[in-house]
Amino acid sequence: MLHPKHLALIASLTLALALTGCGARRSVPEEPLPTKPHSVSPQQPENKDSKEERKPWVRPTGDSIREEMRAVWLTTVYGLDWPKDRADTPDGVRRQKESLVRILDRLKQDGYNTIFLQVRHSGTTIYPTNYEPLSSRLAGEGYFGDYDPVRFALTECRRRGLSMHAWFVTYPLASSKRNPHPILRDHPSWAIHHKGSYHLDPGNPEVRSYVAHLVTDFLRRYAVDGIHFDYFRYPEEAERFNDKSSFIAHGLRHPDREAWRRDNLTRQLREVQDSLRSIHSQALVSVAPLGKLQKIPDLGRPHGWTAYESVYQDPVTWGKEGLVDFVVPMMYYRDVLFEPFLRDWKELVSPYVPVVAGLAPYRIEETGWPSEVIEEQINLAREEGLAGVCFFRETHTGGRFPAVRRIIQEAFKHPALPLAYPRGLAHKPAAPKNLDAAVGQDGTILVRWSMPREASADGTTYRLWAVTTDAHGRREASLLSSTLRDPHCLLVMSDLIDYDCIELGVEAVNTFGVSTPCTEGLELNLAALREEIRHSRR
């Protein structure tokens, strides 16, 4: 854990890094930081410091340093989380923007690092596209002027260092007799009427192509961090889902209809991945499956529905084939319906891809759960080594629910590193080399390292780590910056006044969160440097 004095150092360095263009991790929302350090004034660092020592470097570890997704589902259907106002007038656009900014500010302040923004409902979207109708709840007949809520949300997430994934409701299709959905009008064979509503048929190859096309159309418009599929399954009471004609046409080579249905969802993910490769997209792909992976023989009580048996999701195969980068099972249960299934996800799926536990703070209001259940489940997910947590939904983590908000703030009080996704292992970044520092007479330290020229083009970023030692020999580790885009960073000596020594190390990080450390760190004798600077000013 970090010492209080060291927390003060981090806060001071954060300000210094912001002023000098070093992209430091922040605890409160700020304006976007410059990506390049300003030139040192009044003079450039001139003497490569002799008070330095090179030594093998290993990234610091500890309870306060973890790779973890800290996510929330931001629901737009019916404006449940956002927006409350339609954007069909200038005033409506302004109110939509202001309310989203307040939400993102609050999420950043509370320690989140990932947002799942619902961009497609049951066949309608919140972004302009030629393929599906615009959600009337958000904009009436259309957005005012050139306002684009997805682009605005993406810009605001970037400003706060938040990852944004586009949340697609995949197969349900809302339609009315008075105003049929265009798919029902133009392609009636694509959808099956089931339990009073329509559901796209995953067994129809044209449907799978359509879904993959929606994704590529979206990614050509928006450089989001990922695509997140919800309702990526067969519907409730799937045994009554009337896809017999589709099975006869496309599924007879399978041993039974259940195996065919699972294969349809798996093939959908293959087609999505093929489509992403066709447009050279590095967007992550994730699915929110049901929270109970499969039946557990010795559970000792009814299961309810499960992902594998009830709705034909096969996350184990998805993980083995690398078709998803992570999964977020919706574990909206407690006690005996939570812990055994949590371990199931860990044992069967997490060896292949990260598993992020989807938790249900909405249950506090809707079914009377005590807020402590959420705290227990966060801790259980961490104890089992899962990759993070995600909350459904944003409103139920905010100011209306102070108890659960405090629990989340406490759980997220230390910054987290982004997850490292298996797909990135095939293209690990080069190791930073030649880490050194130049000290200026104005008390600045320019830390720099070398990288291959192509590193900047392929999206490589850098993390700068420090271990400080005070006069009493106490050592503390911190992450000074997690999002540097250039191979240099400027520090200020006055922010290190309480320390006699600082050891620096840097990692190169690719777009999938996979990092490569420098082989040699750099240790600076701060006490000797301060004395040398004082002497040079006489």
Give residue ranges: language-model regions.
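Substrate-binding cleft of secreted/luminal carbohydrate-active enzymes
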Residues: 315-338, 353-424
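Polysaccharide-binding and catalytic clefts of secreted carbohydrate-active enzymes
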Residues: 106, 112-113, 120, 151, ...
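Active-site clefts of carbohydrate-active enzymes
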Residues: 74-76, 284-303, 341-377
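Solvent-exposed loop/turn segments flanking beta-strands in beta-repeat/beta-sandwich domains
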Residues: 452-476, 501
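Active-site-adjacent "subsite" loops/lids of carbohydrate-active enzymes
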Residues: 66-69, 75-98, 165-221, 309-310
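Aromatic-lined carbohydrate-binding/catalytic grooves of carbohydrate-active enzymes
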Residues: 110-145
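Pro/Thr/Ser/Gly-rich low-complexity, intrinsically disordered linker/stalk tracts
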Residues: 403-458, 512-538
